Amino acid sequence: MERAIPGNDTREPAYGERWNGGPGGSTSPFQLPDESPSWTEWRLHYDETNSNQDNPLGFKESWGFGKVVFKRYLRYDGTETSLHRVLGSWTGDSVNYAASRFFGFDQIGCTYSIRFRGVSVTISGGSRTLQHLSEMAIRSKQELLQLTPVQVESDVSRGRPECQTFKEESE
């Protein structure tokens, strides 16, 4: 079993099972091991005054197939090398293989969820749309991880630059 991640808000179906599978495991879609911070490390980086802030050491992601949910916490420091490493934490083939272990004759629900810097994205669909679901999950993960705090801060605090440019041109 995996360690519980403090502040984890990824939804699990009622009575859902949590599997670790380990890297290269026969069932898990993940190809990297769980990198959850230790309790001491988590306490050092967690801001108790802002309960909506995530641990800045990485992000949480999960794949769910029916009642079975696989979760990972991966370290991510915002560098290009780190981005390429975490983008390879699972592939379409590893997801298809893991999901096929739980498919029967009926369609089951499949869900991908990622939480990074207070933003949570969940994509879900049926097992018949798994290929499309994994493609959307890859795009969402890449876009979410490439948003840096500087980009978010500049858009919010400085207003929309295209509006300022338009005003300058019209004067």
From Swiss-Prot:
Name the SUPFAM superfamilies for this protein: Tombusvirus P19 core protein, VP19
Q: Which Gene3D superfamilies match?
A: RNA silencing suppressor P19
> Residue ranges of region Disordered?
1-32
Tell me the GO molecular function terms: RNA binding
Q: Which UniProt keywords apply?
A: Host-virus interaction, Inhibition of host innate immune response by virus, RNA-binding, Suppressor of RNA silencing, Viral immunoevasion
Q: Name a single GO biological process.
A: symbiont-mediated suppression of host innate immune response
Report whether RNA-binding shows up as a keyword of the record. Answer: yes
Q: Does the keyword RNA-binding belong to this entry?
A: yes
Question: A Gene Ontology CC term for this entry?
Answer: virion component
Q: Where is the composition biased (Basic and acidic residues)?
A: 1-15
Tell me, in a sentence or two, what this protein's role is: Viral suppressor of RNA silencing which binds specifically to silencing RNAs (siRNAs). Acts as a molecular caliper to specifically select siRNAs based on the length of the duplex region of the RNA.
State the family named in the UniProt similarity comment for this chain. Belongs to the tombusvirus protein p19 family.
Q: How does it assemble?
A: Homodimer.
Q: Indicate what this protein is called per its UniProt record.
A: RNA silencing suppressor p19
| Source species | Tomato bushy stunt virus (strain B8) (TBSV)
